[in-house]
Every structure is written in C-alpha cells, then in structure tokens.
Curated annotation (Swiss-Prot):
<comment type="subunit">
    <text>(Microbial infection) Interacts with hepatitis E virus capsid protein ORF2.</text>
</comment>
<dbReference type="InterPro" id="IPR001304">
    <property type="entry name" value="C-type_lectin-like"/>
</dbReference>
<keyword id="KW-0675">Receptor</keyword>
<protein>
    <recommendedName>
        <fullName>Asialoglycoprotein receptor 1</fullName>
    </recommendedName>
</protein>
<dbReference type="GO" id="GO:0042806">
    <property type="term" value="F:fucose binding"/>
</dbReference>
<feature type="modified residue" description="Phosphoserine">
    <location>
        <position position="285"/>
    </location>
</feature>
<feature type="binding site">
    <location>
        <position position="216"/>
    </location>
    <ligand>
        <name>Ca(2+) 2</name>
    </ligand>
</feature>
<feature type="topological domain" description="Extracellular">
    <location>
        <begin position="62"/>
        <end position="291"/>
    </location>
</feature>
<keyword id="KW-1133">Transmembrane helix</keyword>
<dbReference type="GO" id="GO:0006955">
    <property type="term" value="P:immune response"/>
</dbReference>
<keyword id="KW-0430">Lectin</keyword>
<dbReference type="GO" id="GO:0005537">
    <property type="term" value="F:D-mannose binding"/>
</dbReference>
<feature type="disulfide bond">
    <location>
        <begin position="182"/>
        <end position="277"/>
    </location>
</feature>
<feature type="binding site">
    <location>
        <position position="242"/>
    </location>
    <ligand>
        <name>Ca(2+) 3</name>
    </ligand>
</feature>
<keyword id="KW-0479">Metal-binding</keyword>
<feature type="binding site">
    <location>
        <position position="265"/>
    </location>
    <ligand>
        <name>Ca(2+) 3</name>
    </ligand>
</feature>
<keyword id="KW-0254">Endocytosis</keyword>
C-alpha cells in the first residue's frame, strides 16, 4: 500500500513536471509590482518622503525670504508714504504762507495805489485851487490899480460860470438871513435862468436842500433880481409849488429851494437850508468869510 502510494505520487510529480515543461517558464512580473513589493516599496517611500521634505524646506525658505522682502517693501512704502505726506503737508503750509503773503502784499499794494490816487487827486485840487487863487489875486490887484471901476474875475472862493460869480455856503440859514447875507456881499440869492445854469448849480450843491432867490411872500412868485418868472426857466417837482400848510410851523410855503435831486420845491422860509449867492462878474467886489 505504501509502495503503491509512492508510485502514484511519483507519477503525479512526473505529470506536474511534464506539465510545467509544456507550459514554459513563468512570465516576468511588472516593474510597478516589483517596485511595490517588499523592501523596494519601503525604499521608494523613504525617497519620496525625503524629496517632499526637501521641497517643503525649499518652499518654506523661499516663503520666508518672500515674507521678509514683503515686510521690507511694506516698511519702505510706509516710510515713503509718511515722508511724502510730510512733504505734501510742508508744501501745503508753505503754499498757505505764500498765499497769505501774496494776499497781504496785494492788500498793501491796493492801499498804496488808493493812497497814491487820493494824494494825486488832492494835489490836483490844490494846484487847481492855487491857480484859481493866483488868478483871482492878480485880478483883484488889477482892479485895485484901476480904482475898482470894473472887475474881470471872481473873488477868492467864488466860482465863475458864464460871466457870473457863485458862492456856495456850507452852513444853513433861514431864507431871509441868507438873502441878507448875499446882499451884504453886493450879490443876491441865485437866480436860475437856464438848464445849463441849473446843472452847474446842482453839480456844486449836491443832494442838499439849498435856498434860491425865488419866493411868493408878497403874492405871485418872483425872482429877487427882477427876472420875469412867468416866461423864465422852471424846474419844479411834480405838483409843486403847493403852498402846503400841514407842516405845523404856521403859514404856508413861500420860499423855493433845490431838493436832493436838484428839482425845485416850495417850503417854509424859516427852515435853515444852505444857500447860493450870485453876482455878475463886473459887480464882484469882495470875498465873503467862510461859514
């Protein structure tokens, strides 16, 4: 029994060897399978781990350098920004100071120009007045040498216009007192006979109530020098003269005066208005005192 089993096993072995010889050598294993088997897989894993570690170290080193460079750039930019802001602020301050200085210089220049213009105007007025006074004095000397028979120029402080001399007061009097003042100067309150004379007088008196030589105290309106009123020049305000009694001063309005716009109005003769004296050039005789 044992021998038979051995024979059978021997036959199986021969059959197996014969079968293997018939099939040929076993096929080679793939490279990946060989690498992943056993110690080779361990070595490959260690190699990859080392490679990854090197890569991580390199990337970390580069990242640290980049962060350091970025930090340096930030500090540089911050310093540059602060420096630029300081410079801009300094320039703004300097610009403001320059602007204020320019404005101050402009104001000083304008003031100097204004003062110079005023000085120039004042100088011209003084020169004009000096020339007028010199001419008047020369005229008066000539009149004295001719025994005062005829005057060819106006006294000092009188203004010549169309062969007449005018004196403009700077204080106020009632109409009758103003009329007496002019008579004492061998003159009369101004008599306006033309639009040209109206403009001349209005220019000198300005917007101030001023007596003229026209009244109706004795009835009809008349000029103090006898000039015909009815046919002569007139420049009344609308609805004037009205001889108004509502002023509460007693009586009506009997004396004429220039108003602030130059037109005429009748008013109470007792009001203290300025006045204008007039005399013909060949009658002017002496200089009145300033009031």
């Amino acid at each position: 029994m044992t021998k038979e089993y051995q024979d059978l096993q021997h036959l199986d072995n021969e059959e197996s060897d014969h079968h293997q010889l018939r099939k040929g050598p076993p096929p080679p294993q793939p490279l990946l399978q060989r690498l992943c088997s056993g110690p080779r897989l361990l070595l490959l894993s260690l190699g990859l781990s080392l490679l990854l570690l090197v890569v991580v170290c390199v990337i970390g080193s580069q990242n640290s350098q980049l962060q350091e460079e970025l930090r340096g750039l930030r500090e540089t930019f911050s310093n540059f920004t602060a420096s630029t802001e300081a410079q801009v602020k300094g320039l703004s301050t300097q610009g403001g100071n320059v602007g204020r200085k320019m404005k101050s210089l402009e104001s000083q220049l304008e003031k100097q120009q204004k003062d110079l213009s005023e000085d120039h105007s004042s100088l011209l007025l003084h020169v004009k007045q000096f020339v007028s006074d010199l001419r008047s004095l020369s005229c008066q000397m000539a009149a004295l040498q001719g025994n005062g028979s005829e005057r060819t120029c106006c006294p000092v402080n009188w203004v010549e216009h169309e062969r007449s001399c005018y004196w403009f007061s700077r204080s106020g009097k009632a109409w009758a007192d103003a009329d007496n003042y002019c008579r004492l100067e061998d003159a009369h309150l101004v008599v306006v006979t033309s639009w040209e004379e109206q403009k001349f007088v209005q220019h000198h008196i300005g917007p101030v109530n001023t007596w003229m030589g026209l009244h109706d105290q004795n009835g009809p309106w008349k000029w103090v020098d006898g000039t015909d009123y009815e046919t002569g020049f007139k420049n009344w305000r609308p609805e004037q003269p009205d001889d108004w009694y509502g002023h509460g001063l007693g009586g009506g309005e009997d004396c004429a005066h220039f108003t602030d716009d130059g037109r005429w109005n009748d008013d109470v003769c007792q009001r203290p208005y300025r006045w204008v004296c007039e005399t013909e050039l060949d009658k002017a005789s002496q200089e009145p005192p300033l009031l």
